[in-house]
Amino acid sequence: MARIHQDHLIDSVADALQFISYYHPKDFVDAVHAAYEREESKPAKDAMAQILINSRLCAEGHRPICQDTGIVTVFFKVGMDVQWEGVTMSPTDMINEGVRRAYLHPDNKLRASILACLLYTSPSPRDRG
């Protein structure tokens, strides 16, 4: 039986969002590098080199790849045998708390693009104060 603690879920969501904010997927970096190696046009090579340099700087400095960090979409699947521990929040509230913490991380604050949810009446998990 899997046991999931509330704080672990919140931290996992926050950590995952921070991670994807500053790391390009390896297949993307490999594809840009391969295209750079094949490219004959100097301006195109320069543009791809800058993309690769920027990608590395983001990864090393833990800074977002793009200023607009987008909209968070979480797909959350829980098995029947999961046992929750230390839970005082609903799964949705735990995920929203993880998103909030990721966006307000003191070392890498992310820019919130959405002020309120477009589909429902619930507010964005981002603090406004």
Label the predicted regions.
Residues R3-H62, Q67, I71-T73, M80-A116:
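Alpha/propeptide regions of enzymes that mature by internal proteolysis
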